Design a protein with these regions (language model features):
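C-terminal motif of bacterial Sec signal peptides marking the signal peptidase cleavage site
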Residues: 21-24
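Acidic, low-complexity Ser/Thr/Gly/Pro-rich repeat segments typical of extracellular/periplasmic
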Residues: 50-52, 56-154
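Bacterial N-terminal signal peptides that target proteins for export
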Residues: 2-13
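Hydrophobic helical h-region of N-terminal Sec-dependent signal peptides
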Residues: 14-19
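Contiguous beta-strand segments within globular domains
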Residues: 34-59
Length: 154
């Protein structure tokens, strides 16, 4: 009996440290970054997104696709010729021509120039109806957010 108690204690003492070795400790890159969303509006002919706390962030990549486009067919533009000015990221018609009566999913990643700040990823639902721009709620398949934070009918 004494041997049995010592062997189970010995096994437990060895198991706990090895679990940490196998799993590793969570580091900065292990944290899940949730997507942000923002308001969309028409300024002149440009479709603009309000970026709070823009500081020195600028777009590193952008994707504009019709809602429902499969991930394999989505198109991305690296280092787009767009800039954030006055906390607005604006897309002129010369960059992308939005079609009336369509819904788009616009995704973009902002990186901080000259700073080690974390990149920020935005996902925005953009609709166009008879020349009027509006934002629409996204489903959990379209945006990464805390589980159950917003109920959206699909």
């Amino acid at each position: 009996m004494v041997i049995k108690n010592h062997s189970s204690f010995f096994l437990m003492v060895l198991t706990i440290p090895f679990i940490f070795l196998l799993m590793g400790c969570p580091g900065q890159g292990d944290r899940l970054q949730l997507d942000e969303t923002t308001q969309v509006k028409l300024i002149g002919d440009n479709i603009c997104f309000h970026i709070t706390n823009a500081r020195n962030y600028q777009p590193a990549i952008i994707s504009i696709n019709l809602r429902g486009t499969s991930p394999k067919k989505q198109e991305f533009i690296d280092n787009p010729s767009l800039r954030i000015r006055s906390e607005q990221l604006c897309i002129p018609p010369s960059f992308y021509q939005f079609t009336d009566n369509e819904k788009y999913i616009v995704e973009f990643v902002l990186t901080s120039l000259g700073s080690a700040a974390e990149p920020r990823k935005f996902v925005v639902g953009v609709g166009l109806d008879h020349g009027q721009v509006y934002g629409f709620p996204l489903t959990d398949r379209e945006i990464l957010r805390p589980y159950g934070s917003i109920e959206v009918p699909e």
